[in-house]
Amino acid sequence: MKQVIKLSLLCSALWLAGCGDETNSSGASTEVVYESYIQQALQRDTTIKFALSGKDANVPLPSFALMNAKDGTLEIPPGSNTSGSNPLVAMGQVDGWPITMPLFLDFKGAGLADNIITSGIYLYELTDSMTGSPSIKALLTNGVDYTAVSSAASDKILIMPTKALNASSEYILAVTSEVSDANGNPVGTSASYAALKSKNKIYSEGDIATLQKVTQGVEKIFQLSGVDETQIVYSTWFSTQSVSNTLFATRGATASAFASGSNQLETVWKQTGLGLDTAYTIQLGTPVDFAAALTADDNFSTYVGADKKTAILGTYTANTVDVTKGTVRLPYYLETGSNWNTQPFESAMPSLAKIKAALADSKEQLTIGSQLLAAGIDTTKLATDASEQLKLMGLTLTKSDGTALDPERYITRYSPVPKVKSVQDVPFLLFTPAGAAPTDIVIYQHGVTTAKENAYAFAKNLTAVGLAVIAIDLPLHGERSLDSTRSANSDPLAYINLTYLAVARDNLRQSILDVLGLRAALTLSQPLFTGTRLSGINVGTGSKVRMLGHSLGGIVGTSAIAESNKTLGSTAADAMYSFSGAAIQNSGGQISNLLLGSAFFGPKIKHNVALSASTEYKGFADAQCASLDDSACYNLFTSLATQEQLAQVTSGFQMFSYAAQTLLDTIDPYSVVSTKLNNGGLTTPLYFSEVDGDSVVPNKVSNPTGSLVYLSPQFAGTEPLATLLGLTTVNAGQTAPNATKSFVQFNSTAKHSTFVAPQDAGYADLAHHTEMQTETADFLADDSLGAVSNSNSVLK
């Protein structure tokens, strides 16, 4: 691996148990006479809600004050529920704040007006953390890089970035008295912030000393940039989370295991008995004619529908396509037992952040240092040398009291490689031109609640241009369902895990790693292809591997493509994961708002979130919804609820989306693409499409006029992702495509899955399906879209 796991100095965990305007964290109390400008700010009618202790404790998000020093994760007080089902606990497994969610500021007193705030909010990016040697890297501009909006209903200010913040980066925020309350008067500060701001009392010990030092350091940076620090009523520093580090580190560790030409996965992971020595191998069965294969395919009957076979067979020309079933052996990082939906990924290595903290602790440095030495690890290289970091794989470090140094094994930038739980024989379908062995191949990934077998509906269009198509099931789908109930085919929430958000994230992360793993297997298994329909596939001699994703498969595919654009520092390693092009249909980014804003999934998800967010809603559901499904129950509630009741459940949705996106940002396509674009361009040729008014994956998500339902929805849906990628929009008004960067918009006669097969009983969308398939085959044949036709009025 070229990239190493970056360590930064982290501030102490700062949820204080005794800090106010005159009390330090050790309990000593003294009267403090504040500077006159602080006294004035304390006496204002409307003040920031920032309290470090007591029943009204409140820290605006995001903040350095809610991070754990020893492992670099968020640390938000969870209340009584300390299980992973608590979103606040789940957020504690993340190594920084989200990059696509807003910043929150709560106020109390006279209140705020509904307003766009044009002055008094300052947001800067720093070169280093506040415990290092920071300087200003970028001055973000209000109205350009972010917008600040105040709400009379909630007395909140939301600061919404217009583009994703940089991952693994440091930011500081300041609010000054230029911001006005509902009466036009300047907002003020809180007692807790006054204690940190004042120079009349400097704390020398305890957590409050660290808080004060950081706060005054932040204000000093703003002062040097021209902001009057005497007018600052609140400031903070925060670190953003890493994005796609686990994808990168897992690719790098895998590539290093094959660097010698043989499989050394067991040596690298230090895990035996799981079958890692045969991982990334492909086994193929005997080719069968398409018609015979589909007719006999019970999985198609189960997961797609036996009634759909006749229509597909009716469009098939006999003896033109072969279907071969087979398996690819892929590492599985999720659980399959009783904890399948409660246990997220676990790291294969102890956290570098915890090791760093232990080596700085006089009580632990000898104990931990000697174990590292015994493992052949040079601690002087550990922070910067990727090969040295790999030596931590499979290692358990024990503290002087006999307990594990890192029992949680959270996946973070400090411990990014996941532990393998099993090696699975993942079934696939391979479609090839009859009797032929194509030189190029397309990996297809289906959408949520369906299965790989839906490729039967369109694969012949790709084989007709000389391509092979290989399709696998997403985790917990199709043949990869754990059983009939632990299956997204019976309940999408088996995959979209709303109860354990870290598992929901890792279901998606596993899916991306599966695509990358299948891609690697197509390179590593090449010697096994002799005499099979894959005998023509040899990446080393010029074979091209392309990606095709629909819906959730497109979400997975987009993140996989963006990740594959990052070099591992070795031509051979990069060749294991390269894609020459990608076609993404009806997909999008910022998954939490995408789902909440989905006409199809939104009501079901809102119902399940509201059950825990609102006792009134739960009471309503218990009384009124015994015979209704989840979506119908929620829709009935919205038709009957008061504005106050709707506001309560909406607040719950906002809390859920913030927590969910905090977990998802690390692998969300919008975040992964943004991070890649910030570190060099995305060079893979792309073809995207959408249908107008898509009911499953929304084109975009926006708040109703005058209300705030979704947080930072400007990143959610298909169109924001297409815009981020710089794609050329093609529609009825502009039919000339960009060969390698097109985004084609179809009109609303087409439906979400028209790409797979016509959805209208009267075939009103048949022409749309045909054009979608024609364009996709055209693009995937050579990574270039030649033409788009609107002769049948299919475009928006």
UniProtKB/Swiss-Prot annotation:
Lineage: Bacteria, Pseudomonadati, Pseudomonadota, Gammaproteobacteria, Vibrionales
Keyword match Lipoprotein: yes
UniProt-listed Pfam families: Lipase_bact_N
Residues annotated as signal peptide: 1-18
Molecular functions per Gene Ontology: lipase activity
Similarity comment text for this entry: Belongs to the AB hydrolase superfamily. Lipase family.
Described purpose of this protein according to its UniProt entry: Required for the utilization of the prevalent host lipid lysophosphatidylcholine (LPC). Functions as a lipase that cleaves exogenous LPC and generates free fatty acids, which are then transported into the cell by fatty acid transporters such as FadL, and used in various metabolic pathways.
Keyword Membrane among record annotations: yes
Membrane topology (UniProt): Lipid-anchor
Phenotype when the gene is knocked out: Mutant cannot grow with LPC as the sole carbon source.
Organism, scientific name: Vibrio cholerae serotype O1 (strain ATCC 39315 / El Tor Inaba N16961)
Factors inducing expression: Induced in the presence of LPC.
Cellular compartment(s): Cell outer membrane
GO aspect biological process, one term: lipid metabolic process
Gene: volA
Keywords attached to this entry: Cell outer membrane, Lipid metabolism, Lipoprotein, Membrane, Palmitate, Signal
Lipidation (N-palmitoyl cysteine): 19
Protein name per the record: Lysophospholipase VolA
Lipidated residue numbers (S-diacylglycerol cysteine): 19
Any Gene Ontology CC annotation: cell outer membrane
